[in-house]
From Swiss-Prot:
InterPro entries: Baculo_ODV-E25. Disulfide bonds: none annotated. GO terms for cellular component: host cell nucleus; membrane; viral envelope; virion membrane. Belongs to the baculoviridae p25 family. Its main location: virion. It comes from the Viruses. The keyword Secreted does not apply. It is found in: Virion membrane; Host nucleus. The keyword Nucleus does not apply. Keywords: Host nucleus, Membrane, Virion. This is Occlusion-derived virus envelope protein E25. Component of the polyhedra envelope.
Length: 229
C-alpha cells in the first residue's frame, strides 16, 4: 500500500514539473547527445531552469576470448561513444589489468561520434597513472598492463597485435570499401575488428566474422571461443 502511494506521489510530482515546463523529456532518450557526456541522474540547466533527467551511458561489453595456444585475451568494448573523461574513469574503475579497451570518442560540443577524425595518425590524447589513451580517427584504444604493440595503418584501417590477438579499427567514415581491405588480414590469426562503418560491418559478416556485442560494432574471427561476462 505504501509503495503504491509513494509511486502515485512521484507521478504527480513529475506531472507537475512537466506541466510547468521544468522537466525536459528529451533528455530521457538514449539518443540525446548529452548522455555520452555524463552519468549524473539529475541536473538543472541554469539558463532554462529545466530539470534534465540523464541516464548512465557507460555500458561496456566485457569478454574473454580464447585463441592460439592456450591464450585468453580480456577485451572491453564501449557500447556507446564516450567522452575522454568517461574513458579515463571507466578505464580506471572497471577495466581490469592485462586488458584491451576500445570504443568511439565523443566530446559534447567539440566533436560528434560520426565526425571524421582530425588526423590519420595515432596520437596519445591522455596519459594517466595506469594507461595511455590513444586515438585513431574517432576511435580510442587503451592497452592496460600489456606490452605496447606495433601499429600499422592502411586503407582507413589501423591494425596491431596485443598478446597474440590481432586487432583492427576501421574508420567509420571510410567509403567506398572493398573486400580487399579485409583480404589483407592474417588468414588464420584470431582477429578482432571494431568499426561503426555500416559497409564494413556488412563485409565482415560476409567474410565469416561473428558479431560479439550488442551494438554490432565488434567482430571476431578465428577464435576458439569467447565468453561475455
Amino acid at each position: 500500500m505504501w509503495g503504491a502511494l509513494i509511486l502515485l506521489i512521484l507521478l504527480v510530482f513529475l506531472f507537475y514539473l512537466w506541466y510547468n515546463g521544468k522537466l525536459n523529456l528529451n533528455s530521457l532518450t538514449e539518443s540525446s547527445p548529452s548522455l555520452a557526456q555524463s552519468s549524473d541522474s539529475v541536473q538543472v540547466d541554469p539558463q532554462t531552469e529545466q530539470l534534465n533527467v540523464k541516464l548512465g551511458n557507460n555500458k561496456m561489453t566485457y569478454m574473454r576470448v580464447a585463441h592460439g595456444d592456450n591464450k585468453v585475451s580480456q577485451v572491453y568494448v564501449a557500447e556507446k561513444p564516450m567522452s575522454m573523461d568517461d574513458i579515463e574513469k571507466q578505464g580506471n574503475a572497471r577495466v581490469g589489468a592485462n586488458s584491451l579497451f576500445i570504443g568511439t570518442v565523443y566530446d559534447q560540443g567539440v566533436r560528434s561520434p560520426n565526425a571524421p577524425g582530425a588526423s590519420n595518425d595515432v596520437t596519445v590524447t591522455r596519459t594517466t597513472a595506469n594507461f595511455d589513451v590513444k586515438e585513431y580517427k574517432n576511435m580510442f584504444i587503451v592497452v592496460k598492463g600489456l606490452p605496447p604493440a606495433k601499429m600499422t595503418k592502411e586503407d582507413n584501417m589501423l591494425c596491431f597485435t596485443v598478446d597474440g590477438l590481432h586487432v583492427c579499427l576501421v574508420d567509420a567514415n571510410a567509403a567506398p570499401l572493398s573486400e580487399r581491405v579485409f583480404a589483407r588480414l592474417p588468414p588464420s590469426a584470431c582477429t578482432l575488428v571494431y568499426t561503426r562503418n555500416s559497409a564494413a560491418q556488412q563485409l565482415l559478416l560476409e567474410n565469416g566474422f561473428t558479431v560479439v556485442n550488442a551494438e554490432h560494432t565488434a567482430f571476431l574471427k578465428n577464435h576458439k571461443s569467447y565468453r561475455e561476462l
